[in-house]
Amino acid sequence: MGYLCGIVNLRMYAMNQNPVLQKENKRQFALDLLRVIACFLVIWQHVTEAYYISPDFTVPTHDEMPLVGWLNSMTPIEVPLFVMISGYFLLPLKMDISAFFKRRFTRILIPFVVWCVLYSAYFMAYRGDTLAQFFRNVAHIPVNLGVEIGHMWFIYMLLGLYMLVPIISPWLEQCSKRQLQGYLGVWAFTTFLPYIHLWFPEVLGECFWNPTPMLHHFTGFAGYFVLGYYIKRYGALSVRNSLLLLVGGYLFTVAIYQYRLERVTSVSDLEICWRFCGVNMMLMTYAFFSLVSRVKWQGDNAFGRWISSYALLSYAVYFVHIMLINFWRDLLSESLAHVYYQIPVITICSFLSSYVVVWVLSKLPKAKVWLGS
């Protein structure tokens, strides 16, 4: 199963759910499609990073940097999409708490540890790490190795959201629509903070001795988690509003990128427009989720079955795709002259080959345990 997306069971309850998405006792193809698109966007973003991040994390100055802004300004919605899908399926909790944690943490943590070890071995072959570095990396798995590897930071955040599920579920079961909108409204305000901080570095109680200022508990990915539940319960945006928010958010993101490209030197400063919990990403994510949720096709042909198969293997694809990106970039980057060739071609090759590798691995004994599929 695609446990990156936090699916408890495909036979989940049908209380006030979006009729386009909900088909009791059946896979929801619209969300399978959304998972696969999110996987593609993850890979696209990680391919693109090589073109705007220098080894010292400064902004490079090559002529195609403006084009990178146009090519990459949609991709950061992928992580919020995964979180919204998780909230759609997991909230509110409908099973015993201990059983929930055992199921979730087992299916997430075992593959995570296995792939951390595999990446530690991979780094010996790919970048020349020593055996001592390998053992040091393995020993560092309980600390923060996932972040040091790079893309596995996501797992820590996902586990944190799982820990939140039994806490917020009782409130979600009894709250009114207006109350839910009130929470989401405060959270939406916090998505302006990355831009507010450009003028006011510390607001609403922020200071070095206070790690939890006024709106701290309303910030971050928990808002996307609840937004996924909100769409299930009350429905998605209209197509018209979704398109307006999606196009408007994209153009705003590109504009901020182009403006800051000439004014900042560090990647962290340039990426402010690509922050997952920024207002522009929030609007685009909400809009894109709403659009795809309206797909009525049930995937009843070979292509649809492949989409569902990809969705089932998406957690393992998330782990392995960096290895495939490195392979295809080393193989193809010199033969493809420009960024607008390199990024799409390397992304497509990595996207397809990641699925093939995981599909082959899924045939091995006990693969479900360490692949998370």
Can you describe what each PLM-predicted range is?
Residues 67-80, 142-157, 195-223, 256-286:
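Interfacial loop-to-helix transition and helix-capping segments at the boundaries
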Residues 237-305:
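Alpha-helical transmembrane segments and terminal signal-anchor/GPI-anchor hydrophobic tails
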Residues 93-99, 170-178, 232-243, 291-306, ...:
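Membrane-interface junctions at the ends of membrane-embedded or membrane-associated helices
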Residues 1-189, 334-373:
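Membrane-cytosol interface segments of multi-pass membrane proteins
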Residues 305-322:
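Helix-helix packing/entry segments at the starts of transmembrane helices
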Residues 262-272, 326-345:
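Extracellular/periplasmic helix-loop-helix junctions in multi-pass membrane proteins
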Residues 44, 116-117, 185-198, 247-261, ...:
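Aromatic-anchored segments of alpha-helical transmembrane domains
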